[in-house]
Every structure is written in C-alpha cells, then in structure tokens.
UniProtKB/Swiss-Prot annotation:
Pathway: Cell wall biogenesis; peptidoglycan biosynthesis. The gene is mraY. This is Phospho-N-acetylmuramoyl-pentapeptide-transferase. It holds the Pfam family Glycos_transf_4. It is a multi-pass membrane protein. HAMAP family: MraY. It comes from Lacticaseibacillus paracasei (strain ATCC 334 / BCRC 17002 / CCUG 31169 / CIP 107868 / KCTC 3260 / NRRL B-441). One of its GO terms (biological process) is cell wall organization. It catalyses: UDP-N-acetyl-alpha-D-muramoyl-L-alanyl-gamma-D-glutamyl-L-lysyl-D-alanyl-D-alanine + di-trans,octa-cis-undecaprenyl phosphate = Mur2Ac(oyl-L-Ala-gamma-D-Glu-L-Lys-D-Ala-D-Ala)-di-trans,octa-cis-undecaprenyl diphosphate + UMP.
Amino acid sequence: MQLAQMLIPMVSAFAITIMFMPLFIGYMRYKKEGQVIREEGPSWHEKKSGTPTMGGLIFIAAIIVSAIWVGIWQHQLTLSVWVSLFILVLYGLLGFYDDFEKLVHHRNEGLKAWQKLAGQILGAIIFLIAYFHEGFDHTLWVPIIGNVSAAWFYVLFVIVWLVGFSNAVNLTDGLDGLVAGQTTISFGTYAIIAAHDGRTDVLIVCLVTIGAMLGFLMFNHKPAQIFMGDLGSLALGGMLAVVAILLHREWSLLLIGIIYVTETASVILQVGSFKLTGKRIFLMSPIHHHFEMKGWSEWQIDLTFWLVGLIGSGIYLAFFL
C-alpha cells in the first residue's frame, strides 16, 4: 500500500468511531448504565462511578467493518485478517459478558477467572488451528536454547502469549486514555513492521485499529466520557498478540508492549511479596495506581507511560527491524 492509501483504513475506522460513539454514550446515559468502580482502587476514582462503559463495542465494530471493506478493496482479505478479527470478537465477547454482569448486578466482578481463562484458551487453540492450516512457520527462537521447532512447544507458547497479553492490556486499562493511547503506539509500531515485511493484510488490521483508537481517545481522555470496558481491553490485547505472532515477531511484544509487561509484573510482584513477607512493594498495583498514590495526575502518568512505550517501540525498530 502507498502512503496515501494507508490513510484510508485509518480514516474509515476513525470516522465510524467518532460518528457512533456519541450516540452510544447518550444511550448508556439514558439507560443509566455505568461503570462500577472497584472498592480496592484509589478512593478518588469513586467519582468516575456511573461513567458509561463498553465503548469497545463501537470501536470493535469500526475495526471489523473497516478491515473487511479495505481488505476487499486491496484484495487482502486473507485468513490472517479473519483470524485477527476472530480473536478480536471472541475475546471481546468474553469481556462483554464480564461488563454486562457488572452492569446488571451492579458489581465490579463478572466472569469467574476460570471461565475467562477457558474462553481465552479456546480462542488461542482455534487461532492455532488456522495458523497451522496456513503452514506458517512455528519455529521459535528461545534464549539459551536456540531455535525450537517442536509444534507442541509453539502451541503452549501461543496460548500463554494470547492469554497473557489480553489480560495484561486489561490490567493496564485503569486510567482515562491510557490503553487507547498505548495501543495506538503498539499497533502503529506493528504497522511499520508489517509494511517493512510486505504483510499488507496485517498492515490493514493495524491501520484500522489505529484509526479506531484515535477516535475512541477523543471520548476517553481525561475526564473520560466513556470507558472501553473489559470488552475493549481483552479484545485489543488478544489481537495485539495475534499480530505479533502473524508477523513471526513474537518476542517483540516484550519491548513494544513494555508497558503491559510492566503493569502485569507489578501485580505479580505485589501479590507475591505480600504473600511471602506480608509487605507490599508498591503503594498500590497495577503500577499506574502507585504513581497516582504518589500524587501524579492521570495525564502525567499517561504521557510518561506513552513515552516509555514509544521508547520501547523505537528500540525494537532501531535494532530488530
């Protein structure tokens, strides 16, 4: 795709998002359906209670519609596009049920952990079936060991990657605008990689996601008019992992997704430390809440985390593209 043509997928998803998001916000306000804030979160987040949620429903629709018509236009409606959208939808449905339970029963807990995990693993397995059907390379370089070509090892790795990063993005979604901005950076980086590698089909998926996220950010920046909900964050995290795998740059997520990795690591360290020593490492986890407790504003945290994400992406592009 030429540079001018790359703008079309982004504009399409952006336009659909900004066109329908205000209508959805209005509908959710009319129905008086809003986010239930976790009791263990920062006390000042209570003022966000009642803010419309499930905004992911609109930008997921924008991504799907734009990816399909652009794929048809560019003759790039490949299996890679379909499996990316499949994971987006399936993980989105898991999040939808989670969000729906929270709204209906007015509590901040939806699906049980094992139910969500089972759905995520099922999605990863279906993705793998399509992946192997297409004959994609399943050789994976592993530090110290070297190249591992065993199919069973790659299967386990992909399941961990999809489940891990969908949950990591979900954990990161705790501040206004944070995930919308960070995923724009992440998918933007993969768009550069896809263009470099000649993967126009994956490039289209990245471009429409960038457009949708920029559109959503207009309503999600502080003070947020709407949240994406688990519906949005689980879907984005799952598809982000799929894109990295389709480009056969699996390990790139450790740098390009450094914020998601850090957020998840902070939770693991916090829980582990408390169980082992009875002491907490951070004032609150995930780590973005730690900085809130230190007195940082949401904008300061957003901008700092986005900068770190940009640096991580820049390092990957500079040394590994």
